Design a protein with these regions (language model features):
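OB-fold and OB-like single-stranded nucleic-acid-recognition modules
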Residues: 9, 26, 30-34
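Short aromatic-glycine-enriched beta-strand elements
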Residues: 70-75, 171-176
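Short, structured beta-strand/loop micro-motifs enriched in basic residues and often containing a Trp
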Residues: 3-14, 76-82
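Short, surface-exposed beta-strand/loop "edge" segments at domain boundaries and coil↔beta transitions
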Residues: 80-86, 178-193
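Short, Lys/Arg- and Gly-enriched loop/turn segments at beta-strand edges
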Residues: 34-47, 105-115
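Mixed-charge, glycine-accented linear interaction segment located at domain edges/termini
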Residues: 98-112, 116-117, 181-188
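Structural detector for short beta-strands of small beta-barrel domains
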Residues: 49-71, 95-103, 118-168
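Short nucleic-acid-contacting surface segments enriched for D/E, G, S/T with interspersed K/R
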Residues: 15-29, 86-100
Length: 193
């Protein structure tokens, strides 16, 4: 069972009002979202789900598809994560996939929308934020009016808390080093008392 992760967080998620600022030592409930820049491959070895961190919040991962819907799907990589996009056409529940994935905090898709559909799996866990880092690479022009982080200067600086309205001219990218503290997932951000 996977209990410690480095989870990506973009400043806009806080700026949209979906979460408050985060600080070291804080307890925070959230689901995990994943995305992949290239298609995931059908896994030849289907026995063990895993996530091995490469850098930032990117992982080499293998997992089992647990849920398919028309416009989102979920996988178990040792911990559940969802993708707010139509699933690949050839994928069914039980299919094992592997490849490089980004793991981030659920911006709002799960807790505001997906969790309200009757067959959605429970995906929100409680986490302790053990450390916070902020990306230090400057933005460079990628053409076509797009700015991206300079990959040759990628780096992280530890900070005690996020400040989404000020950090990096409101464009900060954070890395939350988290430890999962709840065993049983749920659908709501606030646990029933």
């Amino acid at each position: 069972v996977l209990n410690e992760l480095a989870v990506g967080l973009s400043a806009w998620i806080i700026q949209d009002g979906n979460y408050g600022e985060f600080q070291k030592g804080q307890r925070a409930p959230f689901a995990l979202e994943f995305y992949n820049e290239t298609s995931l491959r059908v896994a030849e070895h289907r026995g063990d789900a895993f996530m091995r961190r490469e850098s930032g919040s990117f992982y080499q991962a293998r997992g089992r598809v647990t849920h398919i819907s028309e416009d989102w799907w979920a996988m178990d990589f040792g911990i559940a994560a969802f993708q707010n996009a139509p699933p690949p056409e050839d994928v069914r529940p039980g299919t094992w996939l592997e490849g490089r994935v980004y793991i981030g905090i659920d911006p709002f898709f799960y807790f505001e929308q997906i969790s309200h559909s009757g067959d959605a799996p429970d995906m929100i866990h409680d986490w302790i934020i053990e450390r916070i880092e902020m990306q230090t690479a400057p933005f460079v022009d990628a053409g076509e009016n797009r700015m991206v982080r300079d990959p040759t200067l990628s780096g992280w600086r530890e900070i005690p808390q996020t400040d989404a309205w000020s950090d990096d001219n409101r464009s900060a990218e954070y890395l939350l080093h988290c430890r999962r503290i709840s065993e049983t997932p749920r659908r709501a951000l606030v646990a029933d008392s």
